[in-house]
């Protein structure tokens, strides 16, 4: 056991986590040169296209150290985006240490800090690594100072390496062996294994990635899942060397997979504990805290026949993605679908793309909303995540919106732009500290403003240098109203949104003008109105197509023309009473893109 090292790789987006893991695999001979590909561990097509890591992946390598001993390294490559931070905290729960990778050119960024604090909260040993030292703009001395100054961990003798060229990789491995402690645990005790991750394989059933805390799990053992009490037989156990490799047993301190032919999808939830069916452990391991979704959106299949497939797809995805929350929803405009809770807008995009790709579905998404706390006049407190569930305005005593604490790290020269942006987003500054060339600013900001497009705008005002991480702080009373869209006097429930009173006129106008371009012209006028309660605040109309009925009149009496025009007018009026307007899919997406 003293030859096992479990660690995660944490870093900000694009500081080279996945490339570093490639080099570690190559150095330890996990894969032959022929099988090696860039970013081996980003196995999803989507991850490769976007160049980001979405799922944490685990690998077991054997490393022969300079002291002549062979060490087993279990490491987990984690995502860097703030939307996937729960993936990071899950991976850290399975480790004794973490490699904090920092780009020697960019320096410390917000996500570096957030992930590092998560690791320190869990009492892990954090080993700083300066990556990309082959770049001409790399300045390892300055960055090492920054790490000590901002993060507060010893970094004078931080390992320097370049994952791209492979320089200094052996030093990284030696440091891991020297500085990260071996796992603690009792091989003789009853089995306790923590499920770090599970996914559904259509041939094997549920595959679970586990970390053995105490005891041993052998192939063929009968084990039970502690939350459900169901027993299963371990058909196969093994490790990833990135390839799936079967072994006879997983012993204390190891990280590996278990396949037990579990067919029902929620048979082995993430964060659960496995123990042996006979004389097992009495109490489960502390799991992970449940992450609460921050953003909700309605998602509907375009053809109603897909509803069943859509439900199965969501079930399979939620096994793999523990933070996904969904419940059925119906809309008069879009039919049957689900209300899905996400961790942020990137998460929302990724989930929608995965559903469309991996399960061949065509989906429409409504505008995302955050959760509001509403106090009714009867004194009840309710939580609303769907604009159509909002009680009428005269029954609401007060509405409170979620406020998040955002920590932004930005180079001095872009500070002005960033502050202007934060004020525009109704932010209140609570703190500001200078660290060398960087400034750390803290704002309290409405979550609704942060999740919409704050991240993209922050990146563009600071040329990509500013970085951000945020967490929920409290609910605060605010002047929020519901904006409804009426088409020919009918409310379209899927287009409603909850906005701040100050923005509502501007947003309403922008929305009706955008809709006007997207709704196809009919044979009658279509009135598009934006309303707050019973008050109409903006209107635009899609003009009718009309036939030139007087073209055939040549000369003659004017009353003849009048008669034809009058007849056309009556026809249009009749059509307007019976005609209904199809709202095209682009119009629903217009709500998301008002601000552009």
UniProtKB/Swiss-Prot annotation:
Keyword GTP-binding: yes
Entry's Gene Ontology molecular function annotations: GTP binding; GTPase activity; guanosine tetraphosphate binding; ribosome binding; translation elongation factor activity
Cited SUPFAM superfamilies: EF-G C-terminal domain-like (SSF54980), P-loop containing nucleoside triphosphate hydrolases (SSF52540)
A Pfam family reported for this protein in Swiss-Prot or TrEMBL: GTP_EFTU_D2
Superkingdom: Bacteria
UniProt GO BP: positive regulation of translation
Record EC number: 3.6.5.n1
Keywords carried by this UniProt record: Cell inner membrane, Cell membrane, GTP-binding, Hydrolase, Membrane, Nucleotide-binding, Protein biosynthesis
CDD domains according to UniProt: EF4_II, EF4_III, LepA, lepA_C
UniProt: GTP binding residues: 14-19, 131-134
Residue intervals passing through the bilayer: none
Cellular compartments annotated: Cell inner membrane
Primary role: Required for accurate and efficient protein synthesis under certain stress conditions. May act as a fidelity factor of the translation reaction, by catalyzing a one-codon backward translocation of tRNAs on improperly translocated ribosomes. Back-translocation proceeds from a post-translocation (POST) complex to a pre-translocation (PRE) complex, thus giving elongation factor G a second chance to translocate the tRNAs correctly. Binds to ribosomes in a GTP-dependent manner.
Protein name per UniProt: Elongation factor 4
Species assigned in the record: Shewanella loihica (strain ATCC BAA-1088 / PV-4)
């Amino acid at each position: 056991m003293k030859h096992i090292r479990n660690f995660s790789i944490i870093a900000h987006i694009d500081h080279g986590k996945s490339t570093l893991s490639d080099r570690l695999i190559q150095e330890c001979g996990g894969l032959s040169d022929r099988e090696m590909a860039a970013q081996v561990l980003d196995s999803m097509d989507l991850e490769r296209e976007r160049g980001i890591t979405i799922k944490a992946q685990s690998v077991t390598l054997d490393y022969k150290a300079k002291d002549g001993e062979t060490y087993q390294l279990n490491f987990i490559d984690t995502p860097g985006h703030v939307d996937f931070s729960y993936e990071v905290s899950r991976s850290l729960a399975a480790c004794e240490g973490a490699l904090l990778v920092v780009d020697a050119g960019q320096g410390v960024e917000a996500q570096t800090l957030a992930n590092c604090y998560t690791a320190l909260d869990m009492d892990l040993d954090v080993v700083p690594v300066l990556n990309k030292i082959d770049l001409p703009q790399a300045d390892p001395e300055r960055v090492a100072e920054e790490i000590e100054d901002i993060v507060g961990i010893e970094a004078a003798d931080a390992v320097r390496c370049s994952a791209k060229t492979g320089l200094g990789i052996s030093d990284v491995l030696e440091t891991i062996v020297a500085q990260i402690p071996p796992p603690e645990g009792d091989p003789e005790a009853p089995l306790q294994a923590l499920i770090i991750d599970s996914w559904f394989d259509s041939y094997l059933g549920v595959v679970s990635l586990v970390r053995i805390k105490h005891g041993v799990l052998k192939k063929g053992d009968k084990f039970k899942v502690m939350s459900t009490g169901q027993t299963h037989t371990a058909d196969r156990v093994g490790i990833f060397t990135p390839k799936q490799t079967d072994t006879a047993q997983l012993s204390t301190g190891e990280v590996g997979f278990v396949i037990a032919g579990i067919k029902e999808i929620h048979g082995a939830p993430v964060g659960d504990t496995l123990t042996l069916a006979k004389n097992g452990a009495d109490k489960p391991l502390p799991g992970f805290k449940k992450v609460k979704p921050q953003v909700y959106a309605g998602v509907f299949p375009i053809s109603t026949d897909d509803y069943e497939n859509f439900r199965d797809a969501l079930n399979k995805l939620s096994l793999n993605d523990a933070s996904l929350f969904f419940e059925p929803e119906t809309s008069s405009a879009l039919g049957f679908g689900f209300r899905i809770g996400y961790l942020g807008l990137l998460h929302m995009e990724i989930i929608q793309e995965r559903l469309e790709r991996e399960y061949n579905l065509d989906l429409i998404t409504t505008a995302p909303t955050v959760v509001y706390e509403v106090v009714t006049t009867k004194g009840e407190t309710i939580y609303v995540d769907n604009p159509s569930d909002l009680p009428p305005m005269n029954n609401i005593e007060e509405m409170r919106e979620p406020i998040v604490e955002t920590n932004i790290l930005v180079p001095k020269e872009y500070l002005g732009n960033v502050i202007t942006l934060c004020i525009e987003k109704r932010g209140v500054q609570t703190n500001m500290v200078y660290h060398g060339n960087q400034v750390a600013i803290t704002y309290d900001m409405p979550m609704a403003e942060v999740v919409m497009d704050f991240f993209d705008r922050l990146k563009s005002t600071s040329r990509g240098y500013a970085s951000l991480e945020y967490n929920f702080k409290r609910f605060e009373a605010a002047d929020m109203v519901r904006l409804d869209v009426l088409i020919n006097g009918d409310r379209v429930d899927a287009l409603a949104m909850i906005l701040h009173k100050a923005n509502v006129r501007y947003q309403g106008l922008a929305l009706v003008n955008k809709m006007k371009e997207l709704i196809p012209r009919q044979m009658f006028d279509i009135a598009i109105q934006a309303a707050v309660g019973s008050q109409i605040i903006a209107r635009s109309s899609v003009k009718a197509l009309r036939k030139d009925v007087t073209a055939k009149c040549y000369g003659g009496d004017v009353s003849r023309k009048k008669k034809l025009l009058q007849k056309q007018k009556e026809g249009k009026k009749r059509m307007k009473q019976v005609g209904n307007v199809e709202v095209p899919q682009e119009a629903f997406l217009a709500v998301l893109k008002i601000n552009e």
